[in-house]
Every structure is written in structure tokens, then in C-alpha cells.
Amino acid sequence: VLIEQGLVPEKDEFVLRLPINTSGGDARFYSLAMPVYKDRAYIPTVNDISIGTQTLPLSPLVRIEALAAKTLEEQTPARVSRQILRLVAKEKVRAELARSGGDVGNILANLYNLASEQADTRSWLTLPNQISVARTQLTAGDHVLKLANQNDINFTVSKQGLTLIYLTSINNYFNSHVVQL
């Protein structure tokens, strides 16, 4: 039995407004926006299943939320470097607009810089939060799988092979597939 539960959470945005003095002695405000995952522990809704008289605990195979958070953490140094390069480039554009457009150009460039700074919050939103597995040996024939708060799943185990029961549980959505391997 393989079960997907929940969805990977979406990324949030952390914005830091930094007052920095330029080489000319002027104070400027710069924005730094980074994607973050808020600390939300995932609690699976299904922890065990029953087949006949057997109760089988589900063992987590992978927690994709943890993989997503680890990937984001590993990408942070490169993201910070890119953000610093963007700030330098935006400051160059602002300085040129201030030179050519005076105070109006300077104000417009600063407003654009503050408004345009957004973190890349694209996420793994369509992936399950956790994938778990349960294994057991059954005799050939008809069996019933029971889950809390779900309809029973009737399936047949053939004499020659394996039977995979693939379950998806996301919020109020539930689906099952039985595959003879």
C-alpha cells in the first residue's frame, strides 16, 4: 500500500528593508526579498490501515516538505548573491536616472526598486507532503482495506503476483487505485 498525503506548503515571502548609506553619503532604502517556508509541522491524517484483521502502520517513505525546505536552504547562498547583484544593478540605474532626471528620476527609481522586489515563491505545490508505505503478505483472493473516515476498498490478490494499492489523501479529496503487478 502506497499513500500520498497532503500537499507541500507554499512558500512565503520574507522582506527586509535596509537603510544603507551610499558612497556619496546619502541614505537609501533597499529591499531584500527571500522565499521562506513557515514552520508548519505536517500531521498525516492516516497513520495506519486495516486489511481484514491486520492493522498495518504506515511508514513514511519520504517527506517532500522536508526535501523542499532543504533545497531552499541549500539555494540560499546563491539567492543572496543574486539579490546583492540585483541591488547593485538597481542602484546603478537609480543613479543614472537621478543624473538625467533629477529628483523626479531619483524618486521614481526608488519607488520602482521598492515595489519590484519580490521573492521567488514558486513552490512544489502539486506534490504530496508525505508518501508512506505499508507492506504485508496476503493469501490469494478477495480482501477489504479499511481506512478511517473513508469507504472500504475491495481488491483481489492474484496467485501469481503483487498487488499495489495506491491511495491519495489531500484535504477532503480521496482516491484509490488497485494495480496487479
Q: What is the predicted function of each stretch?
A:
Residues 1-181:
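Short loop/turn and low-complexity linker motifs enriched in small/turn-promoting residues
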